[in-house]
Swiss-Prot record:
The modification Phosphoserine is found at residues 243, 250. Belongs to the peptidase T1A family. This is Proteasome subunit alpha type-3. The modification N6-acetyllysine is found at residues 57, 206, 230. It comes from Rattus norvegicus. Component of the 20S core proteasome complex involved in the proteolytic degradation of most intracellular proteins. This complex plays numerous essential roles within the cell by associating with different regulatory particles. Associated with two 19S regulatory particles, forms the 26S proteasome and thus participates in the ATP-dependent degradation of ubiquitinated proteins. It is found in: Cytoplasm; Nucleus. GO terms for biological process: proteasome-mediated ubiquitin-dependent protein catabolic process. The modification N-acetylserine is found at residue 2. Keywords: Acetylation, Cytoplasm, Nucleus, Phosphoprotein, Proteasome. It holds the Pfam family Proteasome_A_N.
């Protein structure tokens, strides 16, 4: 069967003869062309890191963020089309707010992930709409449930993870994440490793400038999702650059 759409890619409600929905695959392609985002769950929380590419020197520092607060206890990291991601962040916030209004307590992350995944999936069923061109991770921490991390892709499937990467360098990032002993690490340890992984997978040839965005939610923040403090972020970036330099020197010695 041909891998080219040839008419079967005009609508998200049409299957190709070999059982593929091309519009959903194209949406996933938009995620694969985006900057890398990673999320790591550890014993006392969840840490997010995003490689936010700076496409112009004229951009104001800190603009076009790819990390969002969904609720006090839930954070979100995105890859793909930023406008689509913002729309889904608003949907997730609405779900969390409605749940608290109805039941009087914070929404469990699995329930939130399932609800938003159902919404994303609905946009793959009709010809009048297009799939969302973004993937995103949701992370939270509570005393009862501990740390939790979920990823939702453009097809509307929700996965639970210990460590996850989305975006153009996801495979390289996953390889680095697999080397970590996540169940034994704390958020403070993981922040450094997240920064290091983002620096390792960043392609300096194609994408020169980038901003590192870091956030965490865990015991350290009393269950609130917060941007990593500036001094901790700078320390993590310093560790990442030094580790990268050491690896380059060891490679030169081995040649």
């Amino acid at each position: 069967m041909s891998s080219i759409g040839t008419g079967y890619d005009l609508s998200a409600s049409t299957f190709s003869p070999d059982g593929r929905v091309f519009q959903v695959e194209y949406a996933m392609k938009a995620v694969e062309n985006s900057s890398t985002a990673i999320g790591i769950r550890c014993k006392d929380g969840v840490v997010f890191g995003v490689e936010k590419l700076v496409l112009s020197k004229l951009y104001e520092e800190g603009s076009n963020k790819r990390l969002f607060n969904v609720d006090r206890h839930v954070g979100m990291a995105v890859a793909g089309l930023l406008a689509d991601a913002r729309s889904l962040a608003d949907i997730a916030r609405e779900e969390a707010s409605n749940f608290r209004s109805n039941f009087g307590y914070n929404i469990p992350l699995k329930h939130l992930a399932d609800r938003v995944a159902m919404y994303v999936h609905a946009y793959t069923l009709y010809s009048a709409v297009r799939p969302f061109g973004c993937s995103f991770m949701l992370g939270s921490y509570s005393v009862n449930d501990g740390a939790q991390l979920y990823m939702i892709d453009p097809s509307g499937v929700s996965y639970g993870y210990w460590g996850c990467a989305i975006g153009k360098a996801r495979q390289a990032a996953k390889t680095e994440i697999e080397k970590l002993q996540m169940k034994e690490m704390t958020c403070r340890d993981v922040v450094k490793e997240v920064a290091k992984i983002i620096y390792i997978v960043h392609d300096e040839v194609k994408d020169k400038a980038f901003e590192l965005e870091l956030s965490w939610v865990g015991e350290l923040t009393k269950g609130r999702h917060e941007i990593v403090p500036k001094d901790v972020r700078e320390e993590a970036e310093k560790y990442a650059k030094e580790s990268l330099k050491e690896e380059d020197e060891s490679d030169d010695d081995n040649m």
